Amino acid sequence: MAGSLNKVILIGNVGRDPEIRTTGEGKKIINLSLATTETWKDRITSERKERTEWHRVVIFSEGLVSIVERYVTKGSKLYIEGSLQTRKWNDNSGQEKYTTEVVLQNFNSQLILLDHKNSNQNTQGSGHHEYKYPETKNHSFDHSDLDDEIPF
């Protein structure tokens, strides 16, 4: 196989107000929790069932950070595109822990506010704000340079 794909697309609701942090270099990073809910009808009881999955989202893109800072609060409905990343860290007792997050970088990431309600605008849930970095295309890509070997 010549390539792979790491892409996550989610539509869900923000579980709490986004957490904004600033790095030592002054760069802002946002952490938020996004809930997606599946619903189905139980075959035996005909009862409506649902299951909510919580996703950790980390936003590094300066443009997306700016939009989230201004418009996103607990309950906001978002469409996001990003990639999955797992990071390793040590807790206070020195034990290794792993966290998998949906990461929005400066490239291949998108965020759309699906139900933006701003008191200064009369959107009534019909408008949305979108911020997307333009994708670059390399029209002179040479497929003969691809390494077809399995990496393990």
From Swiss-Prot:
<dbReference type="GO" id="GO:0006310">
    <property type="term" value="P:DNA recombination"/>
</dbReference>
<keyword id="KW-0233">DNA recombination</keyword>
<dbReference type="InterPro" id="IPR012340">
    <property type="entry name" value="NA-bd_OB-fold"/>
</dbReference>
<keyword id="KW-0227">DNA damage</keyword>
<keyword id="KW-0234">DNA repair</keyword>
<feature type="compositionally biased region" description="Basic and acidic residues">
    <location>
        <begin position="127"/>
        <end position="144"/>
    </location>
</feature>
<protein>
    <recommendedName>
        <fullName>Single-stranded DNA-binding protein</fullName>
    </recommendedName>
</protein>
<dbReference type="Pfam" id="PF00436">
    <property type="entry name" value="SSB"/>
</dbReference>
<keyword id="KW-0235">DNA replication</keyword>
<keyword id="KW-0238">DNA-binding</keyword>
<dbReference type="GO" id="GO:0006260">
    <property type="term" value="P:DNA replication"/>
</dbReference>
<dbReference type="InterPro" id="IPR011344">
    <property type="entry name" value="ssDNA-bd"/>
</dbReference>
<feature type="DNA-binding region">
    <location>
        <begin position="54"/>
        <end position="60"/>
    </location>
</feature>
<dbReference type="InterPro" id="IPR000424">
    <property type="entry name" value="Primosome_PriB/ssb"/>
</dbReference>
<dbReference type="GO" id="GO:0009295">
    <property type="term" value="C:nucleoid"/>
</dbReference>
<dbReference type="GO" id="GO:0003697">
    <property type="term" value="F:single-stranded DNA binding"/>
</dbReference>
<comment type="function">
    <text>Plays an important role in DNA replication, recombination and repair. Binds to ssDNA and to an array of partner proteins to recruit them to their sites of action during DNA metabolism.</text>
</comment>
<feature type="short sequence motif" description="Important for interaction with partner proteins">
    <location>
        <begin position="147"/>
        <end position="152"/>
    </location>
</feature>
<feature type="domain" description="SSB">
    <location>
        <begin position="5"/>
        <end position="111"/>
    </location>
</feature>
<feature type="region of interest" description="Disordered">
    <location>
        <begin position="118"/>
        <end position="152"/>
    </location>
</feature>
<dbReference type="GO" id="GO:0006281">
    <property type="term" value="P:DNA repair"/>
</dbReference>
<comment type="subunit">
    <text>Homotetramer.</text>
</comment>
